[in-house]
Every structure is written in C-alpha cells, then in structure tokens.
Amino acid sequence: MNSESDNISIKTEYEFYDETQDQSTQLVGYDIKLKTNEDDFMAMIDQWVSMII
C-alpha cells in the first residue's frame, strides 16, 4: 500500500469535509495547520476523527 497516495486522498477528503460541513471554526484551524505542517498530519486526523466519533 502506498501511504503517500493514501495521505493525499485523506487530505483531499478532509478539506472537502471542512469546506462543505463547516460545523466548527476549530476545523478551519486544523486545516490551516495541516497545510503548513505536514509532520502534524496524522495528529490532525486523530483529533478530527475523535470529534466525529
């Protein structure tokens, strides 16, 4: 499995969700961090997923 391609796919879905749902300004903050710091990518996804569950 190509994890780099998976990350791109997840990032695209994350941005799409953020723009269309717009439930919380906190998600916008996470999205900005995601774009500026790739090292925090998985941490952002973990926080985002825990907000949904």
From Swiss-Prot:
Family under the similarity heading: Belongs to the orthopoxviruses VACWR202 protein family.
Record protein name field: Uncharacterized protein VACWR202
Originating species: Vaccinia virus (strain Western Reserve) (VACV)
